[in-house]
């Protein structure tokens, strides 16, 4: 306690002598700074099998060239499952009572198959041999079903792919909502590359799903960016190595290292592991992060040393898995230990937090008229727990003595994209956080270059609660032989509130524009000019303009 008070008093004296440093809190690394992998380009999405299912051909039209015609009175559709009856009448409703050629029966036949496919039922529609005497036409629906799934390949996860696809053969007819789920779950297995093909089976309406399994066992990503503050090292680099499918149980091992350019201000090391449990997509994940920091620039005279240990375990389950809509549920536990020392040895702060959380997240893509649109959202409930040595509210060694390590926090994210024209897209992303308590450093709402608030240093204005919104207009993408590029302009706005005895609110806004793109499907880049409109802290000068650069390349 005496050392803590001595350290705090010494820091106050030194900061008072340096007005710029006084505005830079000797805080621990934020949550965003301890997750540098987010600055790398996301992994390539699994192959979308949307083109796999096409309308089953009804066969050649036997009436082409015929001059025969008749008055259509009704259509008798047989072979359709009960739950699908009545949805195909649109194919012939406009022709009832009209004189049509017999060749138009093939058009009706194909339209019925198209309507069924739009309702996710894959079926073949046939015109059986018949005599049309009273204007009644008989059509027969032969619902497709998978007789067999053939999985080939030597990848360790081949057995897991086969087990994941087993439910495909259990359905009486092919419901694309069900089939897509299992194909996408199989494609989600780490390190697996699937090439599915549909072939005719040996029975009427029977199909065979052939899946060739290839393996991509190792992925290496290297990247760099200049998003950080001067105290944490403006420029940093990151390397991430993913090793997939070592055991055949849908496993992925991830090794990550990040460091400031001079290997001094902040270094982060992380190891992660995930496994599939069963064949329905349930995934167990765990990770451990070790970070050491030695802030420089105006904080260098304090010789601050920080150490962060973050452990995480979680379970994730895909409630809905579809190429156009997804919903997942995640539950987990964060174990956070962070400490700061001044002059290398004098204790200044120590924070031990144990946070349980549950999160629901989803996305949907569709069309608004003829224009593509997408929406994503998540909501998360986090609860600090008094277990495993967690700090208590009022502990003298917390960075914020009035913070509550057992606080309840609600977080929400929302994203939307709408493209009303071929080369123009409107993009909105936002997040909000609410709590009634002052929070420990790790739980605070971080804003800045690593989230929303481009042009401001990461964690420039941490908050206990608040909201942030990023609006963009993207032009393009402009496609060339060697790559693509998309110019954009943006407006960011953040409002944060800090609770506690010295609580305050702050608003940060910025505008700017830039380019993002990809070269040769390997190098992702981003270049952004950001012009802050507000001071980084109340009463201070307006933050300086920033040119932000990010690069990431994927190998192997």
Model-found features: residue ranges?
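Flexible, solvent-exposed coil segments and beta strand-coil junctions
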Residues: 188, 215-222, 247-254, 289-297, ...
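Transmembrane beta-strand segments that form the barrel wall of outer-membrane beta-barrel proteins
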Residues: 218-228, 239, 250-261, 269-271, ...
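Residues that define the transmembrane beta-barrel architecture of outer-membrane proteins
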Residues: 205, 233-237, 265-269, 307-311, ...
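Periplasmic polypeptide-binding modules associated with outer-membrane biogenesis and secretion
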Residues: 2, 23-228, 240, 258-267, ...
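Transmembrane beta-barrel wall of Gram-negative outer-membrane proteins
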Residues: 264-368
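C-terminal outer-membrane beta-barrel translocator/porin domains of Gram-negative envelope proteins
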Residues: 339-485, 489-499, 535-541, 549-554
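Repeated loop/turn-to-beta-strand initiation elements of outer-membrane beta-barrel proteins
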Residues: 218-220, 247-253, 279-285, 322-327, ...
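Outer-membrane beta-barrel "beta-signal"
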Residues: 241, 515-517, 543-556
């Amino acid at each position: 306690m005496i050392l803590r008070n001595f350290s705090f008093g010494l820091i106050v004296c030194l900061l008072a002598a340096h007005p710029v440093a006084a505005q830079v809190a000797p805080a621990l690394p934020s949550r965003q700074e301890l997750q540098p992998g987010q600055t790398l380009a996301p992994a390539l999405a699994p192959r979308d099998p949307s083109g796999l299912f096409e309308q089953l051909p009804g066969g050649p039209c036997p009436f082409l060239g015929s001059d025969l015609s008749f008055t259509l009175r009704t259509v008798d559709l047989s072979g359709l499952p009960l739950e699908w009856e009545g949805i195909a009448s649109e194919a012939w409703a406009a022709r009832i009572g009209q004189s049509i050629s017999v060749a138009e029966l093939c058009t009706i036949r194909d339209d019925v198959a198209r309507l069924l496919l739009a309702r996710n039922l894959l079926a073949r529609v046939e015109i059986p041999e018949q005599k049309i005497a009273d204007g009644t036409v008989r059509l027969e629906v032969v619902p497709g079903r998978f007789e067999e799934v053939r999985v080939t390949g030597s990848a360790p996860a081949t057995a897991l792919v086969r087990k994941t696809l087993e439910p495909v053969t259990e359905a009486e007819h092919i419901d694309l909502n069900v089939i897509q789920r299992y194909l996408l779950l199989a494609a989600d297995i780490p390190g697996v590359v699937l090439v599915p093909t549909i072939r005719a089976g040996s029975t009427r309406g029977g199909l065979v799903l052939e899946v060739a399994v290839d393996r991509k066992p190792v992925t290496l990503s290297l990247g760099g960016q200049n998003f950080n503050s001067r105290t944490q090292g403006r420029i940093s680099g990151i390397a991430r190595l993913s090793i997939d499918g070592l055991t055949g149980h849908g496993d992925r091992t991830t090794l990550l290292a990040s460091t400031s350019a001079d290997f001094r201000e902040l270094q982060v090391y992380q190891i992660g592991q995930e496994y599939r449990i069963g064949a329905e997509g349930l995934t167990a994940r765990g990770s451990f992060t070790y970070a050491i920091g030695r802030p420089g620039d105006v904080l260098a005279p304090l010789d601050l040393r920080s150490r962060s240990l973050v452990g995480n375990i979680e379970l994730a389950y895909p409630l809905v898995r579809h190429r156009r809509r997804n919903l997942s549920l995640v539950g987990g536990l964060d174990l956070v230990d962070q400490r700061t020392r001044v002059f290398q040895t004098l204790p200044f702060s120590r924070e031990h937090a144990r946070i349980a959380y549950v999160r629901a997240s989803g996305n949907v893509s569709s069309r608004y008229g003829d224009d593509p649109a997408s929406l994503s959202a998540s909501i998360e409930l986090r609860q600090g727990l008094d277990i495993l040595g967690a700090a208590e509210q009022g502990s003298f060694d917390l960075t914020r003595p009035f913070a509550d390590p057992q606080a309840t926090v609600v977080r929400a994210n929302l994203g939307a994209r709408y493209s009303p024209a071929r080369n123009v897209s409107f993009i909105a992303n936002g997040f909000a956080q609410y709590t009634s308590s002052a929070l420990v450093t790790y739980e605070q709402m971080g804003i800045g270059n690593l989230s929303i608030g481009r042009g401001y240093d990461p964690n420039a204005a941490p908050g206990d609660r608040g909201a942030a919104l990023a609006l963009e207009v993207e032009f393009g993408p402009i496609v060339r032989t060697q790559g693509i590029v998309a110019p954009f302009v943006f407006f960011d706005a953040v409002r944060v509130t800090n609770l506690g005895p010295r609580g305050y609110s702050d608003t940060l806004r910025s505008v700017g524009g830039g380019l993002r793109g990809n070269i040769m499907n390997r190098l992702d880049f981003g270049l952004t000019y950001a012009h802050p409109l507000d001071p980084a802290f109340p009463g201070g000068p307006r933050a300086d303009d920033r040119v932000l650069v990010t690069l990431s390349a994927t190998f192997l």
